[in-house]
């Protein structure tokens, strides 16, 4: 097995749950999410020679898996991108449903960047590279998402 395939396998094994969680949030269905992650990794293996090395391999893989999930979501009339994970800590503190609703109401780009930042634990540069946007766009988009969520949470408390 080539060194590149070993690296891809290591990313798959170590980050599968993160990929699945983000894909599930994008497509709104666990089965479609598994298919998206699987097919995304198939694309990664088939097109591994296209990785130029200007970003970490995992970041390149994130871009492919996110694009596959978005493609599947469009094809299968998805629910809006949302936090569909039932094992989230927010469920335990009673905030899960209201927060899920608020996150689901955000524009798609804000939700996607929010999930890549907090579910996948990617830094701004990695998110920017994975989505093909600037670091400034990532920061501004996260700031807008935080601001909107903060405003809606404050309104809900009054």
Map each language-model feature to its residues.
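Short amphipathic alpha-helical boundary/capping segments
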Residues: 7-10, 98-106
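Residues within helix-turn-helix
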Residues: 31, 125, 136
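DNA-recognition helix of helix-turn-helix
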Residues: 66, 70, 131-158
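Short, basic/polar amphipathic helix motif occurring as a linker/hinge flanking DNA-binding modules
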Residues: 71-94
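A short pre-motif secondary-structure segment
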Residues: 113-117
């Amino acid at each position: 097995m080539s060194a590149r395939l070993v690296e891809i396998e290591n990313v798959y094994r170590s980050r599968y749950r993160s990929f699945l969680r983000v894909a599930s949030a994008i497509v709104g269905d666990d089965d479609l999410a598994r298919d998206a992650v699987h097919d995304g990794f198939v694309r990664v293996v088939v097109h591994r020679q296209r990785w130029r090395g200007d970003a970490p391999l995992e970041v390149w893989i994130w871009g492919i898996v996110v694009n596959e999930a978005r493609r599947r979501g469009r094809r299968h009339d998805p629910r809006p991108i949302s936090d569909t994970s039932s094992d989230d800590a927010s469920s335990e503190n009673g905030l899960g449903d209201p927060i899920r609703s608020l996150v689901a109401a955000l524009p798609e780009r804000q939700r996607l960047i929010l999930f890549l930042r907090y579910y996948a634990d990617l830094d701004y540069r990695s998110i920017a590279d994975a989505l093909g946007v600037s670091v400034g766009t990532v920061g501004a988009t996260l700031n807008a998402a935080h601001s909107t969520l903060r405003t809606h949470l404050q309104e809900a408390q009054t």
